[in-house]
Amino acid sequence: MATPTSPDDAPPIAPSETVLDTVAAQSAAIDELIGLARQRLQIFDVDLSQGGWQTAARAEKMATFLRRATHPRLELIVHDTRWLEVSCPRLLALQRLHAGAVTVYRTGVEARGAMDPLLIADGRHFLHRFHFSQPRASFALEQPQLARPLVTRFEEIWATGEPGLSATVLGL
């Protein structure tokens, strides 16, 4: 009788780094990174309008990450939350459902010049788009040393963060 295997039973990933030239390739890389994440996803973007963040499939991948991790953390920071509010109801529903694990911030004034979207999974794997207006990006798996400066960059951007979207609606 076959037994299900956990993602942790998967064979080790060979370290790699690739340059991606299309938004479609980046969208596939985002899905792969979400699938690889075990504890923490750090996401910085201008507004999440590119890369398929509004799709049901992406929301399901994010939900799977949040369910399977023991103490998951999804840290999302954007310059502008309007597109997220209007076009990503599934992600906002995940924020409400997993309020303790999902934080959405808006960048502070000090970080508004940052224009190179990042997605970092567990400090080991990443997608780094060189500039939001260009489709080129670096995609790396099992490269914690290459990821380290990007984690630092994300943390610097995160430190400027202001409350973006709340998981709860308060009011009278």
Which residues does each predicted region cover?
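Primarily the HKD phosphodiesterase
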Residues: L33-H98
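Short, well-ordered alpha-helical scaffold segments within catalytic/effector domains
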Residues: A24-S27, D31, A59, A63, ...
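HKD (HxKxxxxD) catalytic microenvironment of the phospholipase D
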Residues: L41, T103-A147
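N- and C-terminal low-complexity/disordered segments
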Residues: T5, A10, S27, D47-A56, ...
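Signature of lipid phosphatidyltransferase scaffolds
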Residues: A2-A10, L20, H131-L172
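Domain-start "cap" segments at the beginnings of catalytic or binding domains
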Residues: M1-G35
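Long, hydrophobic, amphipathic alpha-helical segments used as structural scaffolds
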Residues: D45, R73, V78, V102, ...
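Short secondary-structure transition/capping segments
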Residues: E17-V23, E85-Q95, L118-F132, L150-P163
